[in-house]
């Protein structure tokens, strides 16, 4: 057995133990492991499988998010600052062992930022793929960070990607069908400068999870886990 394999097995053992200590359902853990067995990442995307520096603690939220993703749903994490939205998103991608694509939304985000843009190469016009298409093809987990910072007409291009169609139609190019393992995790803050109200058509394409503020015990767990990682 190679040292890399031994290290991977040790990491897996630690992850399962941490989830069990939080009281995560054994049935959910079994389904999670089955998902990982059925959806091999492949060497090409392995470098995007990034182990988070900070683990996420919160049994109810973790169970809801994992169960939704296992059911093929996309997840929208809502809450104020410092509630662990991005930490949870990164941990979910790692637990499912999927390549991660972090996509930060802002007021100037448009369809070309997300899907791609035309470029001239080898004497022909080709599509320079954006992160959404790359994520779709590799079976990645796309983290749509602060999705409510962008204008609604900019994110409407994602409707067919996020609903039952699970596809991306780019005019002039082939239709991209999402890899079965592809999921999207949105994060959004409420009521901060520059944020916008998401329209119902977009929100309906996610399972919405409201993030609670961490209590003292959760903060202590994070601190202890961070010390062990060093």
Enumerate the predicted regions with their spans.
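AAA+ P-loop NTPase catalytic core and its hallmark functional loops
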Residues: 2-228
């Amino acid at each position: 057995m190679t040292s890399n394999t031994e290290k991977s097995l040790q990491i897996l053992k630690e992850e399962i133990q941490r989830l069990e200590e939080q009281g995560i359902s054994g049935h959910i853990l079994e389904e999670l492991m089955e998902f990982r067995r059925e959806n091999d990442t492949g060497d090409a995307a392995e470098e995007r499988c990034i182990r988070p520096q900070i683990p996420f603690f919160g049994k109810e939220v973790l169970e809801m998010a994992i169960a939704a993703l296992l059911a093929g749903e996309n997840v929208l994490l809502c809450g104020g600052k410092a509630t662990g939205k991005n930490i949870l998103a990164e941990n979910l991608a790692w637990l499912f062992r999927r390549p991660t694509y972090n996509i930060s939304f802002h007021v100037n985000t448009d369809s070309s930022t997300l899907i791609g843009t035309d470029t001239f190469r080898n004497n022909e016009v080709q599509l320079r793929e954006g992160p959404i298409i790359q994520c779709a093809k590799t079976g990645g987990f796309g983290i749509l960070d602060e999705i409510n910072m962008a204008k609604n007409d900019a994110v409407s291009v994602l409707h067919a990607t996020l609903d039952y169609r699970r596809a991306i139609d780019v005019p002039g190019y082939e239709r991209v069908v999402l890899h079965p393992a592809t999921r999207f995790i949105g994060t959004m803050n409420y009521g901060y400068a520059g944020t916008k109200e998401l329209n119902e058509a977009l929100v309906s394409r996610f399972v919405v999870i409201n993030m609670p503020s961490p209590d003292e015990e959760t903060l202590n767990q994070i601190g202890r886990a961070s010390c062990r990682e060093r």
